[in-house]
Amino acid sequence: MYENIRTLGYVATNYTTKPLNDVLKEIDTYAAWPRVSNDTRLRVDGIFFDETPSTYDPFKYNYLSHASQAVKNGTRFRHHFVVHNPGLIPPALITSPTFAQNSYTNLSDITVIFEEKFDKWLDRSTFDALQSHRIRRSKFAVILHSLPNLSKKVLDFVVEQVQEAADWVFLTDVGTKDEYYHSFSTIFEDFVKSVDGGAEE
């Protein structure tokens, strides 16, 4: 196993409209994989909760707390790793002095603070806010799709700028809706090199 890789099960919460019991059943399905398959190699490290809310609400906090604790307290996950993906946290919220107290970030190891088209990342209000927040970058991820045809030097610069907002990053040039993450993009190899400090062949 590689220490920098986390194998995660996928559970959508539908912004907490999915019945919590259904979410817990899906978590249990992933937890049971090694037993059902009789193969310990199918043990996952945690859960990627997609479609989580971005603005704080006590009911939604309680919902996500139950879901996260099912992973954190379970004995069948290798690292008890929890990721929340609200898709976008409003810039005004993420730069608020009370963000840490009025968010769900204490329930997860990583929160995806921005998942969007590359050109929306370039919007001034978004770019400035995501680079000026004061939360530990190790708690945040940024996912960008629909990148244009960039030179390696420009890609290095883009990765460097994204890493000013988050330690966990993923970039792809795939621009077809519902296909963004179904394959390795043509820039994947260069992207990995850029994350590794812009190393050239």
Task: Put a short name on every predicted segment.
Residues 1-201:
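Glycan-processing catalytic domains of CAZymes
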